[in-house]
Swiss-Prot record:
Subcellular location as annotated: Cytoplasm
Positions annotated as active site in the UniProt record: C46 (nucleophile), C49 (nucleophile)
UniProt keyword Cytoplasm, yes or no: yes
Name of the protein described by the UniProt record: Thioredoxin H-type 1
CDD domains per record: TRX_family
A Pfam match: Thioredoxin
Residues under site feature: Contributes to redox potential value: G47, P48
Every Thioredoxin domain range: 2-120
Primary role: Participates in various redox reactions through the reversible oxidation of the active center dithiol to a disulfide. The H form is known to activate a number of cytosolic enzymes.
Organism: Nicotiana tabacum
Keywords attached to this entry: Cytoplasm, Disulfide bond, Electron transport, Redox-active center, Transport
Top-level taxon of origin: Eukaryota
Amino acid sequence: MAANDATSSEEGQVFGCHKVEEWNEYFKKGVETKKLVVVDFTASWCGPCRFIAPILADIAKKMPHVIFLKVDVDELKTVSAEWSVEAMPTFVFIKDGKEVDRVVGAKKEELQQTIVKHAAPATVTA
């Protein structure tokens, strides 16, 4: 399916992960490219999630160097449990396969600030 191909045309979007395989593919892409991955753990019945979704989509358009994923906690229960998600929305910030930060709740300013904070390229210390 062309919609699942990892191509540059995907930049600036929020990608929905509806299967564990899709999650694994995008997670691996984030690790391999050393990009920041922002995961929006959401639920269809969550009002604050619906409020923040267009804001996240707008941020994604402005930051194509960041991978934005959306995971429905009811669809991917194992992924949600693996990342200890207990409230929605929860935004998990991942670099090199590890969680570097988290924002719980539809907090627009905190979400934007945290993305900017972690989207900067990592400085090499040797």
